[in-house]
Amino acid sequence: MEDGFSSYSSLYDTSSLLQFCNDDSASAASSMEISDRIASLEQRVQMQEDDIQLLKSALADVVRRLNITEEQQAVLNRKGPTKARPLGQTLPLRTTVNNGTVLPKKPSASLPSPSGSRKEMVVPVTKSINRTSSSERVSPGGRRESSGDSKGSRNRTGSTSSSSSGKKNSESKPKEPTFSPEEGYVKMFLRGRPVTMYMPKDQVDSYSLEAKAELPTKRLKLEWVYGYRGRDCRNNLYLLPTGETVYFIASVVVLYNVEEQLQRHYAGHNDDVKCLAVHPDRITIATGQVAGTSKDGKQLPPHVRIWDSVTLNTLHVIGIGFFDRAVTCIAFSKSNGGSHLCAVDDSNDHVLSVWDWQREERLADVKCSNEAVFAADFHPTDTNIIVTCGKSHLYFWTLEGNSLNKKQGLFEKQEKPKFVLCVTFSENGDTITGDSSGNILVWGKGTNRISYAVQGAHEGGIFALCMLRDGTLVSGGGKDRRLISWNGNYQKLHKAEIPEQFGPIRTVAEGKGNVILIGTTRNFVLQGTLTGDFTPITQGHTDELWGLAIHASKPQFLTCGHDKHATLWDAVGHRPVWDKIIEDPAQSSGFHPSGSVVAVGTLTGRWFVFDTETKDLVTVHTDGNEQLSVMRYSPDGNFLAIGSHDNCIYIYGVSDNGRKYTRVGKCSGHSSFITHLDWSVNSQFLVSNSGDYEILYWVPSACKQVVSVETTRDIEWATYTCTLGFHVFGVWPEGSDGTDINAVCRAHEKKLLSTGDDFGKVHLFSYPCSQFRAPSHIYSGHSSHVTNVDFLCEDSHLISTGGKDTSIMQWRVI
């Protein structure tokens, strides 16, 4: 080795090379002399390359020996206290390995983290150091291998858009958790990486991994769903004879009685609902859904469910194994008692099929179009006629036996539109279409030719047509946001314009009396009349939703999302108190303990503070240029901790009841992005989780990390939202990849714990949840990853938010 090191140092002895380069006589030397010198240099370089290879080999041997030594030390630690050997005997070349250049590939909780501020720290591996060198920090060996992305590989904003995330548990047998009674910790494994969690001293003697946790005595019941899916779905808004308005969002069909302010929910689907149809009896309803993937990787096929809107009982399920990707259009027949149902799926051929739904038999199917299909409906007087429309097509289908025969709509002198967007029928049986050119076209009954045209009925596309009971036609425009009524001769009667804040009209339905219901692309449901104003009865977010904050003393909560909206909701009245448009996509939020202000963090590193009463901006700051995943005020209201994707926690001093902020500093030490934060009851300590499963502790007032286990293990935490920790590790399913659980929340009474996962499920556990594979009550409703959960101030309700499904669900604790 000494020869190797001498050769290694000679690698940097460049005096002879510099002398050669600076020697003026070299220019006069013969070509033979130059060739000799080059040959000599090449020989020297080759020798030095050989020496480098020798060094690499020696260093690899040192790393191997180091791993063996640390494994032996870990075994000794488990067996009990032993006298530590001298450092030089145990780790002869520890300082060489600790330069941040090479790390062993085997995870070791004893190695110092190679991240930024800790790179040059030399930590001898003995038992005593093991207990103080951030012993709850995971140091996965693969971290340096991905040093190109030091902030970790997982981006919380990029989670899958559905419970059909395709995640599968690890195929290899997962490691079981281990318990060290001597040290008083439990070690669990996520993706094979150890996560060490120390328990309170008073639990060490009585704790057993084999003990079984119990289910909570309380349960959840879905009470209210906020939001509506109008951004990419059509014909999904109807009024039922019960006085309820029916629509859907996520995997829930909502039946909303506006007058009585009550909701009922059909929850038979297991993934996104995409279409809805009401039977002529106005009681039976059909809904179609997308394909999905269950938690264990099994395929969940798209299908149609037919159910009773009074009892909410499922009557029939059709199409399992037949539909592909999703069911996008459905309709009941009208003239034969509604015994037939047609459906179009989202396969490449957009297959149109006709079913006897009561027998669950398919009567016929045919390739409809290579392009998108927007609507399919039976003719009101001829059961055998079906009309479909979409991109570049309008087709009239005739059901004859087991076949469907097609006639294409002939536009003739009329310019063919790019999209035929909607279809309805007149009292005399004419077919009426609205298209992307803004024209209303009337197709004579029984023909595929245009009998009348209303040119330029709207500026831009016509997204919706609705034939009212009195024969009045109502059309809804997209670009112009206008609602126009037409008489039987297609003469304009009334015109109303929907305010820009509500967005383009997506669907139109008839309400009670002269009331019109409107669904918009910005996920509003409006009601009003053609001669009056339209007011929202339902609204929701329009883009991915992550931020959730609960008011400390009122039944209110705030949500914020990538749609740049922050909305304060009244959980009793089930309506927004106010809505604020901010300049950047929002990711996180947190209420000041006084409830007077609320902080909102964004994807850009900026954060805002708003007055809760007036929604006025109090202050705005910027910390870094990456997303702020957590905004958490201390219990005494004197500090604000901000967890960022730049791996730092920014600490601000707070005064004047949340209106004045002074930067204290930042806590640096994590080697991946911050995911969760919690304050101690006395506001003196902070615990944080990161994207690579680290658990670190801090004194935020000094921005210093706390590495003493004896200091941190008995801290009482004001909240428990960290997904990693002794009191919550039982929430993790066996074989989890460490990203399955997005949010954790402990109830204020400290008896319940809720989680939201990547499979659209909300779980309710007993707290503390410190037994492996703890049982839970499981609730469905979200179709996307559940991004956040939190209990209202009095623990009477739980709020959950969906990511891509943009829904907010309010669960009553019973």
Swiss-Prot record:
GO molecular function: microtubule binding; tubulin binding
Subcellular location: Cytoplasm; Cytoplasm, Perinuclear region; Cytoplasm, Cytoskeleton
WD repeat boundaries on the chain: 260-309, 314-357, 362-399, 408-445, 449-488, 492-529, 534-571, 577-612, 616-654, 663-700, 708-767, 774-813
Residues that bear Phosphoserine: S113
Regions annotated as coiled coil: 31-72
Composition-biased stretches (Basic and acidic residues): 142-152
Biased composition regions of type Low complexity, renumbered to the chain: 103-115, 155-167
Record's GO cellular component terms: cytosol; microtubule; microtubule cytoskeleton; mitotic spindle midzone; mitotic spindle pole; perinuclear region of cytoplasm
Region Disordered, annotated ranges: 77-185
Keywords linked to the UniProt accession: Coiled coil, Cytoplasm, Cytoskeleton, Microtubule, Phosphoprotein, Repeat, WD repeat
Primary location recorded for the protein, binned into one broad class: cytoplasm
GO biological process, one term: brain development
Region named Tandem atypical propeller in EMLs: 175-814
CDD domains, sorted: TD_EMAP1 (cd21947)
Compositional bias annotation for Polar residues: 92-101, 127-137
Pfam families documented for this protein: Beta-prop_EML, Beta-prop_EML_2, HELP
Record's function text: Modulates the assembly and organization of the microtubule cytoskeleton, and probably plays a role in regulating the orientation of the mitotic spindle and the orientation of the plane of cell division. Required for normal proliferation of neuronal progenitor cells in the developing brain and for normal brain development. Does not affect neuron migration per se.
Written domain comment of the UniProt record: Contains a tandem atypical propeller in EMLs (TAPE) domain. The N-terminal beta-propeller is formed by canonical WD repeats; in contrast, the second beta-propeller contains one blade that is formed by discontinuous parts of the polypeptide chain.
Known partners and oligomeric status: Homotrimer; self-association is mediated by the N-terminal coiled coil. Does not interact with EML3. Binds repolymerizing microtubules. Binds unpolymerized tubulins via its WD repeat region. Interacts with TASOR.
Family indicated by similarity: Belongs to the WD repeat EMAP family.
Name assigned to this protein: Echinoderm microtubule-associated protein-like 1
Upper taxonomic lineage: Eukaryota, Metazoa, Chordata, Craniata, Vertebrata
